[in-house]
Amino acid sequence: MNYQSTKTFFLCPTRLLLTIILLIVISIPKQAAAAEHQVLPGIDVLAGQHFALLRGKRIGLITNQTGRTTAGVSTIDVLFHAPGVQLTALFSPEHGIRGEADDKLASSVDSSTGLPIYSLYGTSCRPLPDMLRGVDMLVYDIQNIGTRFYTYIGTLSLAMQAAERAGIPFVVLDRPNPIGGVDVQGAVSVPLLPKASAQRTEQQDSGCGALTSIHPLPTRHGMTVGELARLFNGEYGIGSNLTVIPMSGWQRDMYFDDTDLDWVNPSPNMKNLTEAVLYPGLGVLETTNLSVGRGTDHPFEMYGAPWLDAAAVARNLAARQVPGITFTACTFMPTTAGQPYRGTICNGVCVATMDREQLDPVQAGLHLIQAISEVHPERFKADAGFAVEVGDSDAWELLTQEGESPAEVAERWDSALEKFMSVRKKYLLY
């Protein structure tokens, strides 16, 4: 849609009426919105500012189904109808613009707006120069889940780098860290891509493998996406013309269910807050030869295989008395295509979070790994992705062969965590 068609759009009486109705919905007075919602995400704050930062600009929007106002209006629709704003292109992360895909996606066209959708999880994982022609500003609005190896923050970094190279500003509409902004846990990762620089080639960013460990971060980083953007920009050589639109009302000790915002699945198998809380530690089991419950009603809350002695593993874990969590023997059948043991009954352990304030999900994951290894020392295996997601190339051997306790493995990370915390505090907004 070019500038001339935008002017025509606002002259069409039917569309003008639609625009007025939509703007009434998204332009709720701040006091009324605050009374109904304790936390206002960045898109609501931007609307309250009458889109001043975006006016007169051709906007490229990086988003998915989680980009929405407190009233449930998608950020796509908000910006498409915002006065003085010309939305010209959409960019989708892993799982697509609607968050329903489990495979890599090709670029396409949005049926609602007619805008091009450029996939950032296909042949390229960052906006390429051709995609940015006719874009004056990139805007990012995606709900993340607080775990380093969830790919959306890798997409954030690569998009910021692309914006810097194209000489266009980058705007982040901030959203809550659903598992809080206080606890920081896990190993600080070794990045899979070298530090950003103007000398790096476009081809270096084309692969998606680095998205799970693009910068040195602990597994559970305790930062919002806006804070991460500030950290990436200031510490890792991006140097983008960055603006973060902060939330209103969010506090660091809030979990998502403290915000009064509606949960929207950020990916097909991230169906509730409990799974997000467990994911920093137990999500790494996707790199093993277990099913993690994908294709069930409770992914990341059950782990198993047809060969697993569930009762023995559950007894081993009960004896460990892992704080804040329980493990019970169960059976389940994964159904997602391409996942281990699809259509086969698996024996496993089901996980219940009893006290998330006491739970260290990273150490809980280490306990689960060690317990299964003790019961099945020959059968239980992990691929090369385990070291990447945990952030420690020695952790598997230490847990499964050397017999070091989860606490001893975690102690190896303390020095790097302390250094990260001293850097992190410079970029916190709340």
Regions of interest found by a model, annotated:
Residues R98-K104, V171-Q203:
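Glycine-rich, charge-decorated loop segments at or immediately adjacent to ligand/cofactor-binding or catalytic sites
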Residues N144-L156:
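Glycine/threonine-rich flexible loop motifs
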Residues G304-R412:
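Conserved functional hotspot residues or short segments at active or partner-binding sites
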Residues W250-C330:
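Glycine-rich, aromatic-lined ligand/substrate-binding cores of catalytic
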Residues E202-Y279:
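Conserved anion/nucleotide-ligand pocket segment
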Residues Q86-E94, L173:
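Short internal beta-strands
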Residues R15-S27:
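Bacterial N-terminal signal peptides
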Residues D103-V135, T147:
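Glycine-rich oxoanion-binding loops at beta->alpha junctions
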